[in-house]
From Swiss-Prot:
Subunit structure: Monomer.
Subcellular location: Secreted
Keyword Ribosomal protein: no
Protein function: Snake venom serine protease with fibrinogenolytic activities. Cleaves beta-chain of fibrinogen (FGB) efficiently and shows relatively lower activity on alpha-chain.
Pfam families the record matches: Trypsin
GO biological process: one example: proteolysis
Organism: Protobothrops mucrosquamatus
This protein's name: Beta-fibrinogenase mucrofibrase-4
Active site per the UniProt annotation: H64, D109, S203
InterPro entries associated with the record: Peptidase_S1_PA, Peptidase_S1_PA_chymotrypsin, Peptidase_S1A, Trypsin_dom, TRYPSIN_HIS, TRYPSIN_SER
Disulfide bonds: C31-C162, C49-C65, C97-C255, C141-C209, C173-C188, C199-C224
């Protein structure tokens, strides 16, 4: 069984201005409060995703995180303890690979969000640069988010978790998930022996390999973190022209085939 890494109706998030559901990474440790100034929480209806701030006005996340009543929280660490840098934004515009907003588990699971207002850099808000080179199999990658830390049961920590996983050959994921096509614009990442993985609620968050933003959490095995069932991540590098085109105002730009 496979899992789109979104969870719903899990926990009421205690905020001074909203109440939403919440979740975290399997097998990880608590992220350092200073290591994720680019990490955002994306809430819509009763669902949660992650996302990545790529400049003061734009967030990159997964297409399957699209929904109504979307709210985006930046500068957050603890869900229970507010800090002075925390900011709330809503989408001004949302862009997908095509106008029908279609995607599959192995293609076009990417969404670019323009915020209603830019955010200023601070101690806990800063963008993550887009990658300057393609990802390399064997790289050590960092995944992070507020997703469930147990699976299939749900356990919800207060702060984001971070875990190191490996970028694997795409054929490893094809062996685990026979429905995958021969080629895909997704990355395969995880730990072959299991125990560490992104999971429900982490969708849309970043996969950072050798310090570069290479992937977007998309989907994987259910339960999460099982041996020989890595996660799938949208390949950011393959979509650079599309991302940069929209940010520059070129709405005619198209996603790679």
């Amino acid at each position: 069984m496979v899992l789109i890494r979104v969870l719903a109706n899990l926990l009421i998030l205690q905020l001074s201005y909203a109440q939403k559901s919440s979740e975290l990474v399997i097998g990880g440790d608590e992220c350092n409060i200073n290591e994720h100034p680019f990490l955002v929480l994306v809430y819509y209806d009763d669902y949660q995703c992650g996302g990545t701030l790529i400049n003061e006005e734009w967030v990159l996340t997964a297409a399957h995180c699209n929904g109504e009543n979307m709210e985006i929280y930046l500068g957050m660490h603890s869900k229970k303890v507010p800090n002075k840098d925390r900011r709330r934004r809503v989408p001004k515009e949302k862009f997908f690979c095509d106008s029908s907003k279609t995607y599959t588990k192995w293609n076009k699971d990417i969404m670019l969000i323009r915020l209603d207002r830019p955010v200023r850099k601070s101690a806990h808000i800063a963008p993550l640069s887009l990658p300057s080179s393609p990802p390399s199999v064997g790289s050590v990658c960092r995944v992070m988010g507020w997703g469930t830390i147990t699976s299939p049961q749900v356990t919800l920590p207060d702060v984001p978790r971070c875990a190191n996983i490996n970028l694997l050959d795409y054929e490893v994921c094809r062996a685990a998930y026979p429905e995958l096509p021969a080629t895909s614009r997704t990355l395969c990442a995880g730990i072959l022996e299991g125990g560490k993985d992104s999971c429900g609620g982490d969708s849309g968050g970043p996969l950072i390999c050798n310090g570069q933003f290479q992937g977007i959490v998309s989907w994987g095995g259910d339960p999460c973190a099982q041996p020989h069932e890595p996660g799938l991540y949208t390949n950011v590098f393959d979509h650079l022209d599309w991302i940069k085109g929209f940010i520059a105002g070129n709405t005619d730009v198209t996603c790679p085939p």
